[in-house]
Swiss-Prot record:
This is GTP cyclohydrolase-2. Its EC number is 3.5.4.25. Keywords: GTP-binding, Hydrolase, Metal-binding, Nucleotide-binding, Riboflavin biosynthesis, Zinc. NCBIfam families: PRK00393.1 (NF001591), ribA (TIGR00505). Pfam families: GTP_cyclohydro2 (PF00925).
Amino acid sequence: MPVVFVAASKLPTPFATFTMNGFLEEATGREHVVLSLGDIADGAPVLGRVHSECLTGDALFSQRCDCGSQLEAAMRAIAREGRGVLLYLRQEGRGIGLMNKIRAYELQDGGADTVEANERLGFAADQRDYAICLPMLEHLGVSSLRLMTNNPRKVKALTEMGITVAERVPLHTGHNPHNKLYLATKASKLDHMMGNEHQGEVDRA
């Protein structure tokens, strides 16, 4: 899958000044961003996150999901480490796009859970494709990750494409009354490893 590097610039944030690397997915025209910090090409496992775009959670402070909180927590963790990488993939709504995501939310308002809503609209529960991660990581010289995720599918996908996942770092944050069913559904139907349901994992603020 052709993904080409376009340009890089500094991105000052409240957490750290990252390098913002821009990539173009030629087949779809989607523009992806990778934030990097420190020396990530030295061969040692890199603290990282693969984060799919969520306009409602990342930019509009929605409490229907935990996406915005996870994004902030990941950026803070990388800043504390002084070294890391965050892939921001333009795969809104687990790959169904923003307008279909709003349609799915409408169905959820009527009682459907997040998986049922996608399926009623004719989509798979999760349509994201992580193959685009490989050329971006290769460009940055990253071959091993300490991956911040609760999603075993991400671990499996990266491992199958030859990226070493040296450690899975749980990322439990952003729980609130509005997303209780959403998080429970991710655990029960999408096999996400959510907090107290798994011994030895500690919630992270």
